[in-house]
């Protein structure tokens, strides 16, 4: 039987859910938000090997810690190619949102639209293109779990009116 463990931390102004998913000795980070130090400390009990960072979309509140994780752990970053312009606008959008400081804009290592799934720890992670919140939004399906970013909010659909 495959062991899957999910840890999450709500980070940043809008309490973005950042996830560490551990599957049979390998880990992925999903939507690491923008508080690298908090996440790195929280996830330090992780005894598994980080394999990659997967992002559901490119808004700044989901990608702020990506570059720090890439640099520290030498792992690739996966994002849908339709998110490139959103990613490039991250610091402008932070300013409009009234959030001080800047994030380091990460380079996309792999475009999610090129994959139907990826395998981590011997388990298939299905990649579903779910545009609406952003043009390149995706949902990750692992067994009966969905990681959908801002596709849904509590008791409502996610915003579809954001750049």
Task: Show the residue positions of the predicted features.
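Accessory terminal helices/loops
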Residues: 1-5, 74, 160-161
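Conserved beta-strand hairpin/beta-sheet module of binuclear metal-dependent hydrolase folds
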Residues: 2-46, 138-149
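Short, function-defining helix-loop hinge/capping sites that tune catalysis or transport
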Residues: 18, 39, 65, 88-90, ...
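Active-site HxH/HxHxD metal-binding segment of metal-dependent hydrolases
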Residues: 35-119
């Amino acid at each position: 039987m495959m062991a899957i463990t999910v840890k999450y931390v709500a980070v940043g102004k809008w309490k973005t859910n950042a996830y560490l998913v551990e599957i049979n000795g390998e880990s992925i980070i999903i939507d690491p938000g923008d508080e690298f130090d908090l996440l790195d400390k929280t996830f330090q009990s992780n005894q598994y090997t980080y394999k990659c960072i997967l992002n559901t979309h490119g808004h700044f509140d989901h990608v702020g810690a990506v570059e720090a994780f890439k640099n520290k752990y030498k792992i690739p970053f996966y994002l849908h190619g339709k998110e490139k312009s959103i990613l490039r606008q991250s610091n402008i959008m932070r300013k409009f949102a009234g959030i001080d400081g800047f994030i380091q804009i990460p380079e996309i290592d792999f475009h999610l639209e090129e994959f139907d799934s990826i395998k981590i720890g011997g388990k298939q992670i299905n990649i579903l293109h779910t545009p609406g919140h952003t043009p390149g939004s995706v949902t990750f399906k692992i067994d009966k779990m969905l990681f959908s970013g801002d596709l849904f909010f509590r008791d409502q659909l996610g915003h579809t009116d954001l750049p």
